[in-house]
Amino acid sequence: VQPAHLRNVSFNISHHGDWVLLVGDTSLESTVRVGVDVMDFQDQPAGESFDTFSSGFLEQFSAREMAFMKRAAADPAAPVATRNQLRRFYRMWCLKESVVKALGVGLDFNLKSFEFTVPDVEQTIQPTLTTVMQVHEPSADFPEEGWSFEEALLDPDHCYAIAVQTEMEGAGPVMDGSEITKLDWQELLQDAVPYPVQ
């Protein structure tokens, strides 16, 4: 890559519903891997119980992760219970997908080879930075150390997760919850210039 100072640029993009997210890192001191995912809560299966829906994902989530999703409501028969359980499903899916994207592997990657411990509360627009990941068989390609996560709501209908892995020893968390800058399409294009056609 030329120029040389751009060799360590790492970025990732995700889109769903009304949002497009771009995360990046331009640190020159180390190799940083980033991944992001966003999900639209409105994209929900109609008329299906959460147990029926989630049974198709038993190979992707651990028993502990599934239990977290199912604990979303006190009365599992209430319609709001299924909605809240699906919101937790999308939250966990965003976390899994953000790691897969940071690693640069496809969704055929074994999603059960790692699992998350997340705060047992519902997401808000206030970022959660205390999510922890356990890698069951760490390797040079998939270390357990150096991961940081940020997850929150972008609005009432969309959640996101960002995964960052750095190889800097003792770096600690690299996000503090202030990383998200929201731009509408007009702000994004205000300084745009047409690409010269040849």
Which functions belong to the PLM regions below?
Residues 1-198:
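Core catalytic alpha/beta fold that binds nucleotide/phospho-ligands
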